[in-house]
A protein has these predicted regions:
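Mature catalytic core of soluble alpha/beta enzymes
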Residues: 1-345
Length: 345
């Protein structure tokens, strides 16, 4: 990743039918008569994938071709989801977590693992795919006894966390400690969206958008030949948005305490600091704009863990990356260049 290398050198839709973390918004107030004169059609379809609703939109002159492209993109999503699911028996990740070794790992898994370890280094461990034992500990504790795990349990789980415990090459992935496991939840969805967008980028396609429950990747133009307008959800006001942004070719992803939580006060949620073993208590949500959904996905999680000061400072250091953060006190903090994408209506 060019931005990773650069930083390390230096450091040595209108259709709001319910706003998710991000929602595509079409141009507002356009007359039907104007739309009727357009040479292109907007075709969109929503299916349940990767544990969320995934909507794929394609702008094309031929509706049937657009539908075929959308079908092909969903096929690619299915193929990759089968590689990265840690709950589906027999998947490569399931085998690795169960056996502690995976022979002949898929090239896609090696690519994502390499990317994840780069971000681990960049964030000083705030993003760590070996966090799975901690995430599972919290989930199982609340499911089985309805309360937080004990300090001893957390310490035991923490002993299994740390990317230095992963050894891999093109032939195998091996854990150095028994009980380790990986979760690509903070990066795989973005990666899968990126690969599906490659399917959309075909001759004759004016533009496309994939919305995967908080991870969005835009390419080209919308139906009116403009940038895709997206709404970022407010973390404490369901159904309303924090801000609007315009994207032509790029991605935006949101991580938030409200997305999956274990306590009603949102203090304990699905994101766990892999260094401390607890959910971050300073940030409600982070949305990151980057060139790819994988980068935006991982960096939004890492920034939420790092918190306002360190997180925003990190994003400001990264070329081509911008972000917006909402603290637990509902203070809104933006990176220096975020306004380039923000839209005022």
């Amino acid at each position: 990743m060019e931005w990773f290398q650069a930083v390390m050198k230096r450091r040595k839709a209108l259709k709001i039918g319910g706003i998710s973390a991000m929602t595509a918004i079409g141009s507002i107030g356009v007359m039907r008569s104007v739309l009727a004169e357009l040479d292109f059609d907007l075709v969109k379809e929503t299916r349940t994938k990767m544990g969320t609703l995934v909507t794929i939109s394609v702008v094309h002159r031929d509706v049937s071709i657009a539908r075929t492209i959308i079908d092909e993109a969903f096929v690619e999503i299915d193929r990759l989801e089968a590689l990265f699911s840690r709950y589906r028996e027999g998947t490569p990740l399931w085998v690795l977590n169960r056996e502690g070794i995976l022979e002949n790992p898929p090239s896609e898994m090696l690519e994502v693992l390499t990317h994840a370890l780069e971000i681990d280094t960049l964030t000083d461990g705030a993003f760590d795919v070996t966090v799975a034992p901690l995430v599972d500990l919290y989930s199982n504790s609340f499911e089985e006894v309805g309360e937080l795990p004990s300090e001893v349990q957390i310490e035991n789980a923490l002993s299994l966390v740390g990317s230095q415990g992963i050894n891999f090459d093109r032939d195998k992935i091996v854990f150095e400690r028994d009980g380790m496991s990986l979760s690509f939840d903070g990066i795989a969805k973005g990666y899968i969206v990126d690969q599906a967008v490659k399917i959309i980028k075909k001759e004759g396609v004016r533009g496309g958008l994939i919305d995967a429950g908080g991870d969005m990747r835009a390419t080209g133009e919308d139906l009116l030949g403009e940038s895709w307008r997206l709404a970022i959800q407010h973390p404490r006001n369901p159904g309303s948005y924090l801000c609007l942004i315009d994207l032509s070719d790029g991605a935006v992803a949101t991580s938030g305490d409200y997305m999956q939580y274990l306590t009603e006060d949102l203090i304990v949620h699905h994101i766990v600091d892999p260094r401390l073993g607890t959910s971050p208590d300073h940030t409600s949500s982070v949305s990151v704009i980057a060139s790819t959904a994988a980068e935006a996905d991982a960096l939004s999680t890492a920034t939420l863990v790092l918190g306002p000061e360190k997180g925003i400072r990190l994003l400001n250091e990264l070329p081509g990356v911008e972000g917006i953060l909402v603290t637990k006190d509902q203070e809104v903090i933006k990176t220096e260049g975020f306004s380039r994408y923000e839209v005022t209506i």
